[in-house]
Amino acid sequence: MSSQKRPSEESTGSGTKKVKLEETKTPSLKSEASNLALPKMNDSSNNINAVPLALPKGGDKKKKANSKTAQSGKNGGKEDGTGQKQKATDPNKMQDVLISAGVDLKEEEALLSSTVNVSKTQQNAVVIPPHPPFLHPDQVSNFMKKVAKTQNFNLSFTKNTEILDMMSSACESYLRDIITNTIVVSRHRRKGVKVNYGRRSQVAAALRSIAINQKKEEERRMKKRIALGLEKEDYENKMDSEETLHRASNVTATLRAGSKKQYGWLTSSINKPASIGVKSAGKVATEIAARGESGLKFREAREEPGIVMRDLLFALEHRRIGVHNIISKGYARIRD
């Protein structure tokens, strides 16, 4: 083997290059062509050739462009937001604009709060309270306990509230029916019955209208003469006619009841004055008195207004259960 010296380069800190001779041992059998090999590249050139070059893709370009626009928009938005905040935070200008437009902020805030409160109250008021009972549950339970003791069975009605509600509603419907019938009877009692007597002659209708007009004129003249002091009102004839009606009704009632007692509502309530005026002897008064009952006379039915005991008894007579004692006591009270 033969040794051969080859120059080598080393870099120093001062930037100068020193050439060294390195001894290389080469085999003797090697051909001369091996000595003519190309010089080797250093490590940096090998690394550059080893790494392949990557071309930029189209999606990467778009992403980079979008990121740049987003960053620029953020920066611009920050600047615009600060400018708007500075403009919006100027209270004097805003108040001046609102006042010039005729807007009151306090009233608007109050209106907004009131609408919110109203909506909340409406939502809370959706729940409808239950219907209050007609009778108090405690009173109903006590009464039912008394009835249960007489029937020799015990039951706690306070726990079963449905039974108490059912009894209260039943009593309410029962009393409502009785009161409705009583009101209907009272109205029919006070209302006159219209009877169709057939076709009337025109002559009779004309004569009746003439008589009614004459009586109205005579009564008008009589009132004028009494007001002027020319005649005095006759009380005796008026009271005598009403007394006769009361007596006749009392007699009819006694015959119906079979006793000598009289109804209190049939007794006369007219008090005669202590001093009765002297009978007038005027011409008009004598003509009216002479006519008497032969003339036209209008009289209202002597019926009590509203609901009376007999209306209630008539409504109870159509009931079958639990009304016999009440009806007998009611008629006894009317007789007394």
Swiss-Prot record:
Gene: TAF4
Ranges for domain Histone-fold: 141-209
UniProt GO cellular component terms: transcription factor TFIID complex
GO molecular function: chromatin binding; DNA binding; RNA polymerase II general transcription initiation factor activity; RNA polymerase II-specific DNA-binding transcription factor binding
Subunit structure: The 1.2 MDa TFIID complex is composed of TATA binding protein (TBP) and the 14 TBP-associated factors.
Region of interest (Disordered), ranges: 1-93
Annotated InterPro entries: TAF4, TAF4_C
CDD domains assigned to the protein according to its UniProt record, in alphabetical order: HFD_TAF4
Organism per entry: Candida glabrata (strain ATCC 2001 / BCRC 20586 / JCM 3761 / NBRC 0622 / NRRL Y-65 / CBS 138) (Yeast)
Name listed for the protein in its UniProt record: Transcription initiation factor TFIID subunit 4
Keyword presence, Lyase: no
Compositional bias (Basic and acidic residues): 76-90
Presence of keyword Lyase: no
Function as written in the Swiss-Prot or TrEMBL entry: Functions as a component of the DNA-binding general transcription factor complex TFIID. Binding of TFIID to a promoter (with or without TATA element) is the initial step in pre-initiation complex (PIC) formation. TFIID plays a key role in the regulation of gene expression by RNA polymerase II through different activities such as transcription activator interaction, core promoter recognition and selectivity, TFIIA and TFIIB interaction, chromatin modification (histone acetylation by TAF1), facilitation of DNA opening and initiation of transcription.
